[in-house]
From Swiss-Prot:
Its EC number is 3.1.-.-. Belongs to the RNase Y family. Endoribonuclease that initiates mRNA decay. Residues 203-288 form the KH domain. It is a single-pass membrane protein. This is Ribonuclease Y. It is found in: Cell membrane. GO terms for molecular function: RNA binding; RNA endonuclease activity. Keywords: Cell membrane, Endonuclease, Hydrolase, Membrane, Nuclease, RNA-binding, Transmembrane, Transmembrane helix. The gene is rny.
Length: 513
């Protein structure tokens, strides 16, 4: 009995131990499973993070590669454009060289033909003289001694007359050489005593920025700021990869100066929006007008020319913003005034008259875009309008031989103008031709009815026309653009194509009280 009870107890103990062991194993297994599941989840999360990082890295690398390709493409495009421009310049230079050679050959042909004609004439004269001598000898053989003596004296008289004519010609030639030598001495002395600085003008101006973020503010939302500034000033704003700088491009130096001053004021002020831009452009325009007056007064003071009419002084100041073949017209006028005065002093002429006429000789260039006719005649009319003396008026009008000169001072002004212009490096013809083409383009646009103002931009590849909204409706802008296209094609020679951009803007302004 005791044995059976012990066995039963052992069985129960074993059973309990088995259950405990089973539960323990089950708990351990469950804990391991949970640990493995948690570890698997962590591995999965890490894998997702790694995948996301790899994805971002790949996207970043792709963007960098795209940016690099885009920069390479832009660089290659710029290089190709530069190469095309260089080739165009070479073609133009070759064409000019061929034209010059063609003209030279034509002149040589004319010279050869003239020489051949002269040779034929000489041969004819020789033959005629031969026949005359032969006839004369035949006649003399039948004359008496007295008749022969008379003929001999007549021949001697003719020979002496011929020798006297040669002597007179030689004296005249020596006198002319002496006069030329004296003239060269006068001009050389004047040039040696006159030293003037010249700076060839360009069509661009670089405005420094405090940082590159300012470029975005200048452009404005959807480009409204840059459009407003370009429309109000007629100047191209070039914003490229140049760090902390924007470029102002315009063939008209006055517009470029107004745009520069307005932009610099806006940068300092910090408030850049269309209304503020209009205010600054208006203020800059007034500042430029004030500067023009100061430049005119300074030129008159520098050359000691006094008693000028205020409007003449203003026109003189405007010449600072005009160039002729790359030469600043105001500095050119000052140099001509100096040269004319110095030559007048050497020759004992009226120095004051020569300097005054020299300073004012190109005054017509200050308004010749607004009036028809040669600038010399326009300048003469202006001088007459503002009560200059008749000799000054004549010297101005005659410096390109448009009218007859009435004084020696007028001759000196013409000579001084030629000396200043002919100095090596003083002028560049290609820039002047380019500027004249842009001026002609604006002149064609302004000649149409309803046009308020026009600006040639993009180096002459685009003309922007602002029309009067009360005279031209929306349909009229299309018709105006077509008429302008026809006029430009008929009246202007240009490379490539020109974009005609007609803008009609209507504003309604009222005030709430």
């Amino acid at each position: 009995m005791v044995t059976a009870v012990m066995i039963l107890i052992d069985v129960i103990v074993l059973l309990i131990l088995g259950i405990v062991v089973y539960k323990t194993i089950q708990n351990i297994s469950k804990a391991k499973i949970e640990s493995l599941e948690k570890e698997a989840e962590e591995i999965l999360v890490r894998a997702k993070k790694d995948a996301e990082a790899t994805k971002k890295e790949a996207i970043l690398e792709a963007k960098e590669e795209l940016h690099k390709l885009r920069n390479d493409f832009d660089k290659e495009s710029r290089e190709r454009r530069n190469e095309i421009q260089r080739l165009e310049r070479r073609v133009i230079q070759r064409e000019e060289a061929l034209d010059k050679k063609s003209e030279l050959l034509e002149k040589k042909d004319e010279t050869i033909n003239q020489r051949m004609l002269e040779v034929d004439q000489v041969e004819a004269r020789v033959q005629k003289l031969y026949e005359e001598r032969r006839a004369e000898l035949e006649r003399i053989s039948a004359l008496s001694s007295e008749e022969a003596r008379e003929i001999l004296l007549d021949e001697i008289r003719k020979e002496i007359t011929h020798d006297a004519a040669l002597m007179i010609k030689d004296i005249e030639s020596k006198a002319k050489e002496e006069a030329d030598k004296r003239a060269r001495e006068v001009i050389t002395t004047a040039i040696q005593r006159c030293a003037a600085d010249h700076v060839s003008e360009s069509t661009v101006h670089v405005v420094a920025l405090p940082n590159d973020e300012m470029k975005g503010r200048i452009i404005g939302r959807e480009g409204r700021n840059i459009r407003t500034l370009e429309t109000l000033t007629g100047v191209d704003l070039i914003i490229d990869d140049t760090p902390e700088a924007v470029i102002l491009s315009s063939f008209d130096p006055i517009r470029r100066e107004v745009a520069r001053m307005a932009l610099e004021k806006l940068i300092v002020d910090g408030r850049i929006h269309p209304a503020r831009i209009e205010e600054m452009v208006e203020r800059a325009t007034k500042d430029v007008e004030s500067s023009i007056k100061e430049e005119g007064e300074q030129a008159a003071l520098e050359t000691s020319v006094h008693g000028l009419h205020p409007e003449i002084i203003r026109l003189l100041g405007r010449l600072k913003y005009r160039t002729s073949y790359g030469q600043n017209v105001l500095k050119h006028s000052i140099e001509v005034s100096y040269l004319a005065g110095l030559m007048a002093s050497e020759l004992g002429l009226d120095v004051t008259l020569a300097k005054r006429a020299g300073l004012l000789h190109d005054i017509g260039k200050a308004v010749d875009q607004e009036q028809e006719g040669p600038h010399a005649l326009i300048g003469g009319d202006l001088a007459k309008k503002y009560h200059e003396s008749p000799l000054v008026i004549n010297a101005i009008a005659a410096h390109h031989s448009d009218v007859e000169m009435q004084s020696l001072e007028a001759v000196l002004v013409q000579a001084a103008d030629a000396i200043s212009a002919a100095r090596p490096g003083a002028r560049r013809e290609t820039l002047e031709a380019y500027i004249k083409r842009l001026e002609k383009l604006e002149e064609i646009a302004n000649s149409h009815e309803g046009v308020e103002k026009s600006y040639a931009i993009q180096a002459g590849r685009e003309i922007r026309i602002m029309v009067k909204p009360d005279k031209v409706d929306d349909a009229g802008t299309i018709e105006l653009a077509r008429n302008l296209v026809k006029s430009v094609e008929e009246e202007l020679e240009y490379p490539g194509q020109i974009k005609i951009n007609v803008i009609r803007e209507t504003r309604a302004v009222d005030f709430a009280k």
